[in-house]
UniProtKB/Swiss-Prot annotation:
InterPro entries: AAA+_ATPase, DNA_recomb/repair_RecA, DNA_recomb/repair_RecA_CS, P-loop_NTPase, RecA-like_C, RecA-like_N, RecA_ATP-bd, RecA_C_sf. The lineage of its organism: Bacteria, Pseudomonadati, Pseudomonadota, Gammaproteobacteria, Pseudomonadales. Gene3D superfamilies: P-loop containing nucleotide triphosphate hydrolases (3.40.50.300). HAMAP family: RecA. This is Protein RecA. The gene is recA. It comes from Pseudomonas fluorescens (strain Pf0-1).
Length: 352
């Protein structure tokens, strides 16, 4: 760049800073680039499929799928993982269907969970915005977009037509809260339902509710489906689940993860680790027996998973080996740096 252009750019930057404040425009090379902080989903395979070890903080995420596919279970699992790391979480229950007992079984600390059951869609989104702007909440779940009913529709007659009202509401709300979410470094997850488009001859007839705004504003979109049943004898004890990363602005999209959701227990993490361990050579399988680092840990997947549940230090070691191998070096380095920082903060607090 020649001297005249440099002077003109410096003058423009100076004027922008005086008018809009310091940091309104900056060079990307002025600061060290850091990996995007993430919150685990509770599924190791899904964390790896997302590419950064979980769902990104400071972003909007959409999770959609058919009924009884595990949407709410997945979000409650995210809350449980976030609470383990000391995060503050909120659940905006527009469907008025949250079961505290079930949430507790999945590992959620229901005593510390903030819950709102709003009357209208406007109220739900306003509460979400206020929680984000407080800078004190780390994870917010909105369940669900389909239940965000505009006030005009609630106060109107049953047969009244309200064309595009919900889509306009979502578009306006997302324009307003997106910037606040980034500044607060808060993860906001919208659960959505599926509808069928009429008269579609080619391609998928499926679409999500609430218009197109959420599709654009979401950094990550997850399509969750139930693919089969988990049985113990003749009794169905859970469901086989597949999650596809349909959109991903923070890593490569279109990856898939498959795991089991056990009724009353949630995501079957130990069983998932056994499967991934065998696939990537950390766990040896000989006939029905499984061995880890030369030691037999169980006959059959269920017994091997029980061994991991009874020996959390072995489970933690296997999980670390899988994450180190399957996640990018930048993500691992950033997680180690944050762990070191937390240790230093704890030591500083102890000194005080």
């Amino acid at each position: 760049m020649d001297d005249n252009k440099k002077k003109a750019l410096a003058a423009a930057l100076g004027q922008i800073e005086r008018q809009f404040g310091k940091g309104a425009v900056m060079r990307m090379g002025d600061q060290d680039r850091q990996a995007i902080p993430a919150i685990s989903t509770g599924s190791l395979g899904l964390d790896i499929a997302l590419g950064i070890g979980g769902l990104p903080k400071g972003r909007i995420v959409e999770i959609y799928g058919p009924e009884s596919s595990g949407k709410t279970t997945l979000t409650l699992s995210v809350i449980a993982q976030a609470q383990k790391a000391g995060a503050t979480c909120a659940f905006v229950d527009a469907e008025h269907a949250l079961d505290p007992e079930y949430a507790g079984k999945l590992g959620v600390n229901v005593d510390d969970l903030l819950v709102s059951q709003p009357d209208t869609g406007e109220q739900a989104l306003e509460i979400t915005d206020m929680l984000v702007r407080s800078n004190a909440v780390d994870v917010i779940i909105v369940d669900s977009v389909a239940a965000l009913v505009p006030k005009a529709e609630i106060e109107g007659e049953m047969g009244d037509m309200h064309v595009g009202l919900q889509a306009r509401l979502m578009s306006q709300a997302l324009r307003k809260i997106t910037g606040n979410i980034k500044n607060a470094n808060c993860l906001v997850i919208f659960i959505n339902q599926i509808r069928m488009k009429i008269g579609v001859m080619f391609g998928s007839p499926e679409t999500t509710t609430g218009g197109n705004a959420l599709k654009f504003y979401a950094s990550v979109r997850l399509d969750i489906r139930r693919t089969g049943a988990v049985k113990e004898g003749d009794e169905v004890v859970g469901s086989e689940t597949r999650v596809k990363v349909v959109k991903n602005k923070v890593a490569s999209p279109f990856r898939q993860a498959e795991f089991q959701i056990l009724y009353g227990k949630g995501i079957y993490l130990n069983g998932e680790m056994i499967d991934l361990g065998v696939l990537h050579g950390f766990v040896e399988k000989s006939g029905a027996w499984y061995a880890y680092e030369g030691t037999k840990i169980g006959q059959g997947k269920a017994n091997s998973a029980k061994f991991l549940a009874d020996n959390p230090e072995v489970a933690a070691k296997l999980e670390k080996q899988l994450r180190d191998k399957l996640l990018s070096p930048a993500v691992i380095a950033d997680s180690k740096a944050s762990a070191v920082k937390e240790t230093e903060d704890d030591l500083a607090d102890a000194d005080i």
